[in-house]
Amino acid sequence: MELKIHDFQLSILRELLFRPNARFRDLKKVDITNDHFTFHLKQLVKEGLVIKQNKVYSLTDEGKEFANRMDTEALRIERQGKIAVGLHAVRLRNGKTEHLVHQRLKEPFYGWYGSQSGKVRWGENPLDCAKREFREETGLTGKFTLKGIVHYHHFHQDGRLLEDKYFWIYKVENTKGDFMEEVPEGKNIWISEAKYRKLKNVFATFDEVREVLNSKKLLYLDRARFVKSY
């Protein structure tokens, strides 16, 4: 969960961005009592964002990373798009291609269908994330080929932006392992193209998936979706 920071604490972090080593009097730019200000300064030290040495305050490495995401004029932490992987597995069964689809059984988008996916963890590269997520969500391994990056904006019908995600899309072939039909987050189903096209509430249509998987070059696409519920 994102760390919640009080406006007074953001003010302190902003000062330390531009004044790497500052004393108490240098940081107190807001009109509050010394006790009140000291409380917020101690909270930043407790959270590991600020360090005090010889009566001088400075940002820790964690504090620098956190404060660097700040809009210093608006005095707020900027929200950024999430980075994830999308994993579309295919196989031949009786001479026909089948696609592995995941029915999501958790919020948001409960009941929707799409490819396996997962967030890229801190310090993890997309390919390692793809292999880990696919193994955890399906029990399978396979050959992973990066096909493109798709940037999704999901909007509510009233115009509110609900999600902003960048997906590294991998095609997964030659799958093997102990297939898991059900996992805590949903169900995994191998289906034909005809059945895929009949699915409702899909994150990407079959034609959109095929456009990426069949591309001869690495693609970058921006796509927007408007939904009734989230």
Language model: regions and residue ranges:
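Unchanged
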Residues: V120-F144, H151-T205
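Short amphipathic alpha-helical interaction segments
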Residues: V30-K46
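Conserved beta-strand and immediately adjacent loop positions that scaffold enzyme active sites
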Residues: G86, E98, K187
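Conserved Nudix-box catalytic region and its N-terminal flanking loop in Nudix hydrolases
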Residues: N21, K28, I32-N34, K96-E136, ...
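Acidic, metal-coordinating catalytic segment for phosphate/diphosphate chemistry
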Residues: V56-G86
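Short hydrophobic alpha-helical segments used for membrane anchoring or interfacial signaling
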Residues: V90-L92
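Nudix hydrolase/Nudix homology domain
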Residues: L3, D7, E15-T33, Y110, ...
